[in-house]
């Protein structure tokens, strides 16, 4: 995963370049 902190919801998403560029709330916004 990226160097940025991740949320439980973000962990559920497959690791990719996108997850490294989006903010911490990625899982929630998605």
Swiss-Prot record:
Keywords: Elongation factor, Protein biosynthesis. The lineage of its organism: Eukaryota, Viridiplantae, Streptophyta, Embryophyta, Tracheophyta. It comes from the Eukaryota. This is Elongation factor 1-delta. EF-1-beta and EF-1-delta stimulate the exchange of GDP bound to EF-1-alpha to GTP. Belongs to the EF-1-beta/EF-1-delta family. The keyword Protein biosynthesis applies. One of its GO terms (molecular function) is translation elongation factor activity. EF-1 is composed of 4 subunits: alpha, beta (1B-alpha=beta'), delta (1B-beta), and gamma (1B-gamma).
């Amino acid at each position: 995963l990226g160097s940025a902190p991740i949320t439980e919801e973000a962990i559920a998403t497959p690791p990719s370049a996108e997850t490294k560029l989006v903010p911490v709330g990625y899982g929630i916004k998605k």
